[in-house]
Amino acid sequence: MATKIRLKRMGKKFYAVYRVVVMDSRTKRDGRAIEEIGLYNPNTQPSTIEIKSDRAQYWLGVGAQPTDQVLNLLKITGDWQKFKGLKGAEGTLKTAAAKPEAAVLVEEAENKAQKLKAAKAEAAAKAAEAETPAEVQHDDEKVELADVEESAPESV
C-alpha cells in the first residue's frame, strides 16, 4: 500500500487549520487517515507547527512519501534532516515568546496604578504648598484694608 504524509484540512471557511496525517495515497483529501501525527495552523503569528517527531520518523522509515507542503513542514521542524542524516537536525522552527502569567500582569498593573496615585498626590501637595503662601498674602491685605477702614473718620 502506497502511503503519503499529507495535510487534512480542518477549520472554518477562510480559517483553515490542517492536521498532518498518514493516509493511503488513493483516499480523498479529507478521508479516513491511518494516523494523525501533527497539526499545522498558518493563521497564528508565528504559524503553529506541532509534529510528533518519533511517529514522523517511523512513517518516513517505512516508506511513506511526504507531499511538498508536508516536506517543508518537516524541514522546518528538523525531522527531514534527522531522517536523511543531514546537518541542521534542530530545524529552523521559531518559537513564540512566552506570555507572562496573569498574576505577573496583575502585579505590574497594580504597581503602575500605585505610582500614578503617588505622583498625583505629590503634585497635589506641591500645588497646595504653592497656594498656601498666596492665600496668606491675600489675608494680610484684607487685614490691612480693614485696619484702614476702621481708622478712617466716618463721613456724614
Curated annotation (Swiss-Prot):
Keywords: Ribonucleoprotein, Ribosomal protein. GO terms for cellular component: cytoplasm; small ribosomal subunit. Residues 124-156 are annotated as: Disordered. Residues 136-145 have a biased composition (Basic and acidic residues). Residues 146-156 have a biased composition (Acidic residues). GO terms for molecular function: structural constituent of ribosome. Pfam families: Ribosomal_S16 (PF00886). One of its GO terms (biological process) is translation. Signal peptide: none annotated. Residues 124-135 have a biased composition (Low complexity). It comes from the Bacteria. Belongs to the bacterial ribosomal protein bS16 family. This is Small ribosomal subunit protein bS16. It comes from Bifidobacterium animalis subsp. lactis (strain AD011). The gene is rpsP.
